[in-house]
C-alpha cells in the first residue's frame, strides 16, 4: 500500500480553517487547546480526570454496550464500551449524520483518524482512550442524508431514496426506514462489477436494512430506521477496530442528559450572551465569517411533539415552539418536563458539542472544516454550561487510487499534482500533441489567406457598385461560418481518433476528482466490493498517522 501526499489540497477554502491548520496564533483566542501540541492532550486528560468530567460513567457504558450489541458490533467494540465505565478511561469522539451507504467517504476517514489518534494517545498518556462515533440520530435533514454518489466506470452515479422529504421534521433515528431503500440497494448492486466480494457486501447491505430497531420500537412502529441501517453498516465496516457507536437519540442517554436540558432551559440568557460573545470575537477580533445563524430568543433546544422535532424559543418565563405560539409553557413547566421526559428534547448545533462533553470524558473531537468553525464560536458557551471545550483535531483527508487509475497516471506520465490541478489543460495539450496534421495551424493559416483575398475581392466589387457592401459582408460571414463548421468537423474527428486517451483522462477525473474531492462524493462501499470487506480495517492498521495535516493518496 503506497501512500503519497497530494500538493495544493486544502481541507477547506475557509480562511478560518486554513488558519486553524497553519496559523495557530490567529485562532488561539477562540479555542481551549492547540491541537498540534502533545501538551494539549496531557492538559485535557488532567482536567478530565481531575474533576472536569463528572458524568455517570456506569450508565453511559451500559447504554453504549446495549446499543452496540443491538447493532451487531463485535467484541472489540463491546469491550471498549465497557471500558468507558472505568474512572481512568477517556473518549476520542467524532460523528456524522446517518447517510445512506455510510454516506460520503469522509465519514469513514473521520472515524479512521479518531481510532488511530486514540491508539496513539492511549500509548502516550498511559490510560485507555476509547474511540466513539456519535451518530447524529436526532438530525432531520433528510435531503442531505438521502443520497450519495458512487463511481461507475468513466462516470459518477447519484443514488437517492425516491421518497419526497419536503417538510419532514422526524429525526432519522425515530422514523421508519424509507421503503425505497430496497430499490436503492438493487440499483447499487447493478452498478457494481462482479467480484469475489460483491455477494457478501450486497448481502450485508440487505441484512442491515431489515434488522429490528436498535433504539425505540414504538417510535418506528417496530421497523428499523435509517440510523439503524447506518449504524449496522458502520459497525460491520469497522469490526476489529474497537470503534464504539453512540446514537444521540438513544432514550437511555437522554435520561442521563436530563439535568443538562434543565440547565439549558434555566440558563438561556447566559448561553445567549456566551454565543453572542463567541460570534463577536470570531467576526470582529479574528475577522472570520460566522457559520451559525443566531435566532433571537433561541433556547438551542428542540422538543418532540407528535414525532416532529420542533425548535424552542423563550423569553422571560414563557417558552414556545417557533412559529407555533399556541404550543407554549412556563419555563418551570418545561424544566419539569425535561427532567421527567428528557427523551422529548434534543440539542441544536450550538449545544450539541457541549452535551457531548457532558456525556463523555472527551479528550478530543475529530471534525471536518464546518465543525472546526462551529467550535470556534463555542468556547464561552462551554463555560456557561460548566464544561470545557476538548482538543479539536482536523480529520485526515484521503483519495483512494485504484490500480487501473494508477496505470493511467503512469502511462501518461502524470503526477498527482497534474491529476488534481491541471487535468483539463493536459487533456487539451494531449489533443494538440497528437495533432500531427496541424489542424489548428492549417485553419488559422487558411483564415489569414481568406481574409486577405476576400478583402481584395470586396474592394473590386465595391468599385463596381458601392451599394453592394451588405452583400459582400453577408458573403464573408457565410464563408466564415462554413470554415468554422469544417474546422469543428475536423476537430471532432481528431478527438474521435484520440478517443481512447481522452476516455482515460475522463476516467481519471471521474474517479479522482468527481465534482470536487473524491472523499466528499463517493461512498466507501464500492471499494469494499472491489477490494474486500476488511479494506477499512486494513487502512486503519496500515496508514500511518501524520503530524500536522495533508491530503494523501492511498494506492490500493
UniProtKB/Swiss-Prot annotation:
List the InterPro entries. Bacillithiol_biosynth_BshC, CC_BshC, Rossmann-like_BshC
Which Gene Ontology molecular-function terms are recorded?
ligase activity
Supply the enzyme class, top level: ligase
Is Ligase set as a keyword in this record? yes
Sorted alphabetically, the keyword list is: Coiled coil, Ligase
Which residue stretches, if any, does this entry annotate as coiled coil?
A: 408-442, 468-513
Q: What is its EC number?
A: 6.-.-.-
Protein's UniProt keywords contain Metal-binding: no
The Swiss-Prot or TrEMBL record describes its family as follows: Belongs to the BshC family.
Purpose of the protein: Involved in bacillithiol (BSH) biosynthesis. May catalyze the last step of the pathway, the addition of cysteine to glucosamine malate (GlcN-Mal) to generate BSH.
Can you say what this protein is called?
A: Putative cysteine ligase BshC
Q: Which gene encodes it?
A: bshC
Amino acid at each position: 500500500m503506497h501512500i503519497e501526499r497530494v500538493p495544493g489540497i486544502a481541507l477547506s477554502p475557509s480562511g478560518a480553517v486554513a488558519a486553524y491548520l497553519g496559523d495557530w496564533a490567529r485562532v488561539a483566542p477562540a479555542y481551549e487547546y492547540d491541537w498540534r501540541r502533545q501538551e494539549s492532550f496531557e492538559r485535557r486528560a488532567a482536567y478530565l480526570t481531575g474533576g472536569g468530567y463528572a458524568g455517570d460513567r456506569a450508565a453511559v457504558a451500559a447504554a453504549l454496550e446495549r446499543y452496540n450489541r443491538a447493532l451487531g458490533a463485535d467484541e472489540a467494540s463491546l469491550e471498549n464500551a465497557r471500558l468507558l465505565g472505568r474512572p481512568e478511561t477517556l473518549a476520542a469522539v467524532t460523528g456524522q449524520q446517518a447517510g445512506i451507504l455510510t454516506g460520503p467517504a469522509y465519514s469513514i476517514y473521520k472515524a479512521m483518524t479518531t481510532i488511530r489518534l486514540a491508539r496513539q494517545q492511549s500509548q502516550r498518556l498511559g490510560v485507555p482512550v476509547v474511540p466513539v462515533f456519535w451518530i447524529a440520530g436526532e438530525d432531520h435533514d433528510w435531503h442531505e442524508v438521502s443520497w450519495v454518489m458512487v463511481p461507475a466506470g468513466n462516470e459518477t452515479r447519484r443514488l437517492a431514496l425516491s421518497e419526497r422529504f419536503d417538510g419532514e421534521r422526524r429525526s432519522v433515528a425515530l422514523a421508519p426506514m424509507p421503503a425505497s431503500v430496497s430499490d436503492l440497494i438493487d440499483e447499487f448492486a447493478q452498478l457494481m462489477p462482479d467480484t469475489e466480494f460483491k455477494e457478501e457486501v450486497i448481502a450485508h447491505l440487505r441484512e442491515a436494512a431489515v434488522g429490528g430497531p436498535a433504539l425505540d420500537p414504538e417510535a418506528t412502529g417496530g421497523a428499523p430506521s435509517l440510523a439503524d441501517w447506518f449504524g449496522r453498516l458502520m459497525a460491520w465496516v469497522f469490526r476489529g477496530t474497537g470503534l464504539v457507536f453512540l446514537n444521540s437519540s438513544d432514550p437511555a442517554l437522554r435520561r442521563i442528559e436530563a439535568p443538562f436540558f434543565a440547565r439549558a432551559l434555566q440558563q438561556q440568557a447566559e448561553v445567549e450572551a456566551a454565543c453572542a460573545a463567541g460570534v463577536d470575537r470570531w467576526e470582529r477580533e479574528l475577522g472570520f465569517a460566522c457559520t451559525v445563524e443566531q435566532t433571537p430568543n433561541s433556547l438551542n433546544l428542540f422538543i418532540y411533539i407528535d414525532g416532529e422535532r420542533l425548535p424552542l424559543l423563550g423569553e422571560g418565563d414563557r417558552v414556545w415552539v417557533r412559529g407555533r405560539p399556541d404550543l407554549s409553557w412556563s419555563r418551570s413547566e418545561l424544566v419539569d418536563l425535561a427532567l421527567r421526559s428528557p427523551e422529548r428534547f434534543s440539542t441544536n448545533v450550538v449545544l450539541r458539542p457541549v452535551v457531548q462533553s457532558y456525556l463523555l470524558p472527551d479528550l478530543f473531537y475529530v471534525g471536518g472544516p464546518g465543525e472546526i468553525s462551529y467550535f470556534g464560536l463555542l468556547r464561552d458557551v462551554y463555560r456557561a454550561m460548566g464544561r470545557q471545550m476538548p482538543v479539536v483535531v482536523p480529520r485526515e483527508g484521503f483519495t483512494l487510487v485504484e490500480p487501473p487509475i494508477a496505470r493511467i497516471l503512469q502511462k501518461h506520465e502524470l503526477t498527482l499534482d497534474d491529476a488534481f490541478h491541471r487535468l483539463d489543460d493536459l487533456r487539451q495539450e494531449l489533443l494538440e500533441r497528437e495533432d500531427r496534421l496541424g489542424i489548428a495551424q492549417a485553419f488559422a493559416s487558411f483564415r489569414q489567406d481568406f481574409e486577405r483575398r476576400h478583402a481584395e475581392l470586396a474592394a473590386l466589387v465595391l468599385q463596381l457598385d458601392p451599394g453592394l457592401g451588405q452583400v459582400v459582408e453577408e458573403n464573408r460571414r457565410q464563408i466564415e461560418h462554413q470554415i468554422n463548421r469544417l474546422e469543428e468537423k475536423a476537430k471532432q474527428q481528431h478527438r474521435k481518433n484520440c478517443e481512447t486517451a481522452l476516455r482515460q483522462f475522463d476516467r481519471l477525473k471521474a474517479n479522482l476528482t468527481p465534482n470536487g474531492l473524491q472523499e466528499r462524493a463517493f461512498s466507501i462501499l464500492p471499494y469494499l466490493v472491489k477490494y474486500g470487506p476488511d479494506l477499512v480495517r486494513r487502512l486503519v492498521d496500515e496508514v500511518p498517522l501524520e503530524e500536522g495535516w495533508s491530503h494523501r493518496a492511498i494506492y490500493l
